[in-house]
C-alpha cells in the first residue's frame, strides 16, 4: 500500500488503475488521488455483495469497487495442539514458547494486542496504545515470539512452528494442503480488510480502467480469481459457485457474530501514528527473536 501510494503521488498520470486496501483508499480520497467511478460503465458492480459496500473508508462508494477481502487469524497444527483454539490468548500461552510466529508489522501485531486488551484496532487513546504495547512486551517474556515476514506460510508446513498469525488466504490454502492445519478467526474478532479496484485522479485511460474493473467483477472472473488466490470474494454470484466446503467455511465467510467483532483499519492521524511508532520501537528493542522488524 505505502509503495503504491508513493508511486501514484509522485508520478501523476503514470498509473490508471490501483488496488489499495481500505485505509489507503480513505487516505487517497482525502488527498484527491482517486477519481469517482461511473457505475453506468461497470454493470457487473451489481454482483458485489451489500456487506462490502458503503463502508467507512468510502461511505458513498464513489471511488472503489471491492475486489478481494480477508482477515487476520491463527493457523495451528492440530496434530500437535489438541486444545481448542478460539482466542488470541493462546499466542501468549507460555507452553508454546519459541513456537509462536507474529507479523513483522506495526499495525497488525499491535492490532492483535489491542483486541486482546479489549480495545479497537484503530484506537487513538494513548493509554490503550500503551496497554497494547505492554501486552506485546509481556508476550515477549512468555513465549519469545518470532517476528518475520510471511514465515507462517513456511514454518508451520516445515514443522518449525506450531501456531502462527497468518492472513486468511494463506491460512486457508495451507489448510487445503494439509488437513492437520487449521485456520481460525478468534472469537474476539480480528482485522477485516478489503482490497478494491480504484481509478487514479490523473488516469489517462479511464475507459480501459473501467472495462478492466467490469471484467474482474464478472461472476466467472471473480470465481477464477478466488479459486487461484485463495482469498474470499465479495462477488455474491461467484460465491454461490464455489465448492460447498469453501462457501460454507465459517473461517472464510465468517458468521455474523464474528464478523460484527471484526474491524477495518482506518487511516490514523499523524499524532496517533507517532504513538504507534513509539510503541513499536520499544517492542522491537526488547525482542531478540526477530527477522528485521519493520514498520
What name fits each language-model region?
Residues 73-80, 114-118, 193-208, 216, ...:
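A bilobed periplasmic-binding-protein/Venus flytrap-type ligand-binding module shared by bacterial periplasmic
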Residues 200-261:
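Mature extracytoplasmic/periplasmic domains
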Amino acid at each position: 500500500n505505502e509503495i503504491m501510494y508513493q508511486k501514484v503521488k509522485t508520478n501523476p498520470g503514470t498509473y490508471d488503475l490501483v488496488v489499495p486496501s481500505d485505509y489507503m483508499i480513505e487516505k487517497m480520497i482525502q488527498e484527491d488521488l482517486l477519481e469517482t467511478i461511473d457505475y453506468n460503465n461497470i454493470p457487473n458492480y451489481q454482483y458485489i455483495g451489500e456487506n462490502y459496500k458503503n463502508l467507512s473508508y468510502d461511505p458513498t462508494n464513489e471511488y472503489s469497487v471491492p475486489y478481494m477481502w480477508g482477515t487476520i487469524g491463527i493457523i495451528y497444527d492440530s496434530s500437535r495442539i489438541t486444545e481448542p483454539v478460539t482466542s488470541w490468548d493462546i499466542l501468549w500461552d507460555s507452553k508454546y514458547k519459541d513456537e509462536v510466529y507474529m507479523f513483522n508489522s506495526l499495525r497488525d501485531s499491535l492490532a492483535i494486542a489491542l483486541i486482546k486488551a479489549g480495545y479497537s484496532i484503530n484506537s487513538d487513546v494513548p493509554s490503550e496504545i500503551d496497554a497494547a504495547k505492554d501486552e506485546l512486551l509481556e508476550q515477549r517474556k512468555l513465549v519469545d515470539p518470532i517476528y518475520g515476514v510471511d514465515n507462517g506460510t513456511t514454518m508451520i508446513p516445515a514443522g518449525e512452528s506450531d501456531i502462527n498469525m497468518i492472513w486468511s488466504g494463506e491460512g486457508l490454502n495451507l489448510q487445503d494442503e494439509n488437513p492437520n492445519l487449521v485456520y481460525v478467526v478468534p472469537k474476539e474478532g480480528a482485522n477485516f480488510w478489503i482490497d478494491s479496484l480504484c481509478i487514479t485522479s490523473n488516469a489517462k485511460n479511464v475507459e480501459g480502467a473501467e472495462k478492466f474493473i467490469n471484467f474482474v467483477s464478472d461472476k466467472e472472473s471473480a470465481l477464477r480469481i478466488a479459486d487461484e488466490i485463495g482469498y474470499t470474494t465479495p462477488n455474491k454470484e461467484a460465491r454461490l459457485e464455489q465448492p460447498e466446503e469453501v462457501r460454507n467455511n465459517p473461517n472464510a465467510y465468517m458468521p455474523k457474530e464474528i464478523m460484527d467483532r471484526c474491524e477495518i483499519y482506518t487511516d490514523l492521524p499523524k499524532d496517533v501514528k507517532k504513538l504507534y511508532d513509539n510503541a513499536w520501537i520499544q517492542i522491537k528493542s526488547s525482542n531478540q527473536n526477530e527477522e528485521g522488524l519493520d514498520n
